Amino acid sequence: MSKRTFQPNNRRRAKTHGFRLRMRTRAGRAILANRRAKGRASLSA
């Protein structure tokens, strides 16, 4: 039996999918712009 692949960790979640990471790159800012345009309640982790 293999282990479960999702091992929740809030710090890792924020570091890989967080708002500050999204703001760092041009592509990340594009993602945020798309999510704002769509009207998402939460923009990032």
UniProtKB/Swiss-Prot annotation:
The keyword tRNA processing does not apply. One of its GO terms (biological process) is translation. GO terms for molecular function: structural constituent of ribosome. It comes from the Bacteria. Keywords: Ribonucleoprotein, Ribosomal protein. It comes from Streptomyces bikiniensis. One of its GO terms (cellular component) is ribosome. Belongs to the bacterial ribosomal protein bL34 family. This is Large ribosomal subunit protein bL34. Pfam families: Ribosomal_L34. Transmembrane segments: none annotated.
